[in-house]
Amino acid sequence: MISREEAINFLNSTSSKDILDKLAQINNTFKREYITYSKNVFIPLSKWCRNKCGYCIFREDKPSLMKPNEVKEILLKGDRLGCREALFTFGEHVDENKEIKEQLKSMGYDNILEYLYDLEEWTLNNTSLLPHTNCGILNYDELKMLKDVNASMGLMLENASERLMNTIAHKHSPGKHPKLRIEMIENAGKLKIPFTTGLLIGIGETNEEIVDSLFKIKEIHEKYGHIQEVIIQNFRAKKGIPMENFKEPSPIKMLKVIILAKLILDDISIQIPPNLNRETGQLFLLAGVDDWGGVSPLTRDYVNPEAEWPEIKELREWTEELGLKLKMRLPVYDKYISEEWLSEKVYNKIIEMGWLKE
């Protein structure tokens, strides 16, 4: 619906008319009744990570690992609160840490993915939550193994530019090389794993790099059809990170990127984190956002701990003020709930939950 050159010109433009024209185009083209969200629990199995991103506060040097009883307690509490997504995450390649490796061995596991698989299988067997894993770079065989117990999986592309590997954002983060991330997203497509990816805006990228990243996601999705949602996430400066003095992207910049994401990505859902956009989130709905992402009544956002989740009643108020309806979803979007896209275990669990009848 828009060319690369047109998209770059739009981001570079200071014309308010350009913005209003494209907002009108989006609202005339994409007819929406519902804005969705996922009610989840956030389970950070470990915060140690081989990457040291300039904007990250999630990473810890301490090689800690959540114990099974800690995880199961959160899952059971979340189940009682009506959560339906279990977001499992940990730092990339935690197995490189000797102390974590020893902790895993003491529990009878050779690696973190064996431990993760058991926890996710337990989740399916003992709760009404569905696992979604986002743990950094995984290879084809690892993705294939985890597909068996995951409703969907995710990895932020962040940006497709290799140039950022030489900047404060990613110079100490080998796992953030776009070739690795693109390869993983493509492998997920080959395996028919419903997938979440996204861009991180404000980490030193150029407008051209933003546009090229959106077109790269489009290219991959056109080949495999597995990208269910794209997150447009704004960088937030935090005390103590290397990029604490970096300027955050303006609301207008975010608005324009969201507009382009909708025009370029078409039928892929566009998500923004509501806890990072409390004052501007409603405006972004006008630009094509149709999903608020995961929010939790139990656990905090460990990636952005300073930003509390809004309550669901707040999301409903923000949504209904624009004449739209708020609707809860699973971590896998309804259009991917089929035997074509899900493992037998996960598909049968969703049928057992009666979700498709709701």
Curated annotation (Swiss-Prot):
Required co-factors: [4Fe-4S] cluster
UniProt domain Radical SAM core: residue ranges: 35-275
Cleaved signal peptide residues: none
One Gene Ontology MF term: transferase activity, transferring alkyl or aryl (other than methyl) groups
Pfam family, one: Radical_SAM
Transmembrane portions of the chain: none
Residues engaged in binding [4Fe-4S] cluster: 49, 53, 56
Catalytic reaction list: 5-amino-5-(4-hydroxybenzyl)-6-(D-ribitylimino)-5,6-dihydrouracil + S-adenosyl-L-methionine = 7,8-didemethyl-8-hydroxy-5-deazariboflavin + 5'-deoxyadenosine + L-methionine + NH4(+) + H(+)
Functional pathway: Cofactor biosynthesis; coenzyme F0 biosynthesis
Family annotation (CDD domains): Radical_SAM (cd01335)
Function recorded in the entry: Catalyzes the radical-mediated synthesis of 7,8-didemethyl-8-hydroxy-5-deazariboflavin (FO) from 5-amino-5-(4-hydroxybenzyl)-6-(D-ribitylimino)-5,6-dihydrouracil.
Membership in a protein family: Belongs to the radical SAM superfamily. CofG family.
Protein's UniProt name: 7,8-didemethyl-8-hydroxy-5-deazariboflavin synthase
Source species of the chain: Methanocaldococcus jannaschii (strain ATCC 43067 / DSM 2661 / JAL-1 / JCM 10045 / NBRC 100440) (Methanococcus jannaschii)
Lineage: Archaea, Methanobacteriati, Methanobacteriota, Methanomada group, Methanococci
Gene field: cofG
